[in-house]
């Protein structure tokens, strides 16, 4: 559960309505793979990830980034039940993929950076603060099934 004030919830929802999920998703996942290259080990089947340009131009990275942000959108629609919303993904990432849950925090922070880049002055400090709460809540929900 994420505790947002009505103003924060409104700010998150208003900005998210303007997000191009295809573009932002691919950019966020691509940046994660470039900035934190050890995360690439989970995406070996994606082909060439040898350079920043290869990562950022990789169609599989873009497609998976879109999928990730689709799940994030679901979370925004269920802020009062993030653990329930992400239970299946938490299990998958824990039991099958063995993803270090710290990576969820990294991706959340990268997403905030990408949103700031895309929205500039519209991404005010209060909007950022609200998004930081949301990405922390999502990361916590995704880590819920870890033992």
Swiss-Prot record:
Residues annotated with Phosphothreonine modification: 13
PTM annotation (N-acetylvaline): residues: 2
Residues recorded with modification N6-acetyllysine: 60, 83, 145
A Gene Ontology biological process term: hydrogen peroxide catabolic process
Entry binding sites for heme b: 64, 93
UniProt xrefs under InterPro entries: Globin, Globin-like_sf, Globin/Proto, Hemoglobin_b, Hemoglobin_oxygen_transport
Record's keyword annotation contains Cell inner membrane: no
Tissue: Red blood cells.
Gene3D superfamilies linked: Globins
Keyword Chaperone belongs to the record: no
Residue stretches making up the Globin domain: 3-147
UniProt modified residues of type Phosphoserine: 45
Family: Belongs to the globin family.
Description of how the protein assembles with itself and partners: Heterotetramer of two alpha chains and two beta chains.
Record's function text: Involved in oxygen transport from the lung to the various peripheral tissues.
Name assigned to this protein: Hemoglobin subunit beta
Taxonomic lineage of the native organism: Eukaryota, Metazoa, Chordata, Craniata, Vertebrata
